[in-house]
């Protein structure tokens, strides 16, 4: 039985078959950050109190990890998962690593100045807009920027025009990476988040169905998945953004997975570094693994603190920096 209390003020558990995970726990609030290093396991209390038995169970779990991991207070194993939805950029692929360094300067360049404008303040505002919308289709960042232009008395371009110019600039940045991969001059692992293949192989070995949903335009996602050797894991289940932004969303992908397979949300796990897939997965009762990846330092095993805090805030069950502990992670999720 799954006694899952949704965090909407209700203390009444909702019964579902087979799963043993809570969406909300009355006995604990907040989360713990566990760091495994040379001197063993350290437990850092974030912002809540819990009972000693809970502390003990978390401690036992994290001793199994060689790297960093953070469990939300509501995490419990869910052994009935059979479908897994991945985000792409920053979750598996690093081909587009550094994309904010393209988008932010473009926005700064095109943002109308105002009297008494503080460049640092405008930059912080734009960066917050960009990262808050990370995980959604690129067009939403462009729509938000168009609003900022109008707020300052400017006449914004159509959001698609901003998007196409951004993609043109981004293509210049990543072209050498694409060329190296397509010409076999680079090993795909160089542009995969650390441990990605081990995780994917572990999921395939369990017989779980894999899906890829990205805010990047679908033709680019399919091209880059193929360059990285990931297309075989996902087959026809690779979905990406369209110019008609209303025709695609990660929420729609999740609804399609559940409908076509005639399953409830507790059969679903979402894995991503953006708030959208985490939030959408949790909204249907799925388990959410947040990847707070430090893309600039792949393999270092460090959290990106902005991602970590943001993803915990939208309900992530587990936060990891990469997949160095892929086998342990899957065992813990299954309750082994």
Regions found by a protein language model. Give the residues of each.
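Active-site neighborhood of HAD-like aspartate-dependent phosphohydrolases
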Residues: 55-124
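Substrate-recognition element of Asp-dependent hydrolases with the DxDx(T/V) motif
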Residues: 103, 187-191, 196-226, 239-243
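A metal-dependent, Asp-based hydrolase signature
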Residues: 128-205, 209
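A short, structured active-site edge motif that brings together acidic residues
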Residues: 160-161, 231-247
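Short acidic-hydrophobic, aromatic-tinged amphipathic segments that line or gate anion-handling sites
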Residues: 239, 318-323
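Conserved Lys-Pro-Asp/Glu-containing loop-to-beta segment of HAD-superfamily phosphomonoesterases
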Residues: 248-281
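Acidic, Mg2+-coordinating phosphoryl-transfer loop and its flanking beta/alpha structural elements
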Residues: 270-318
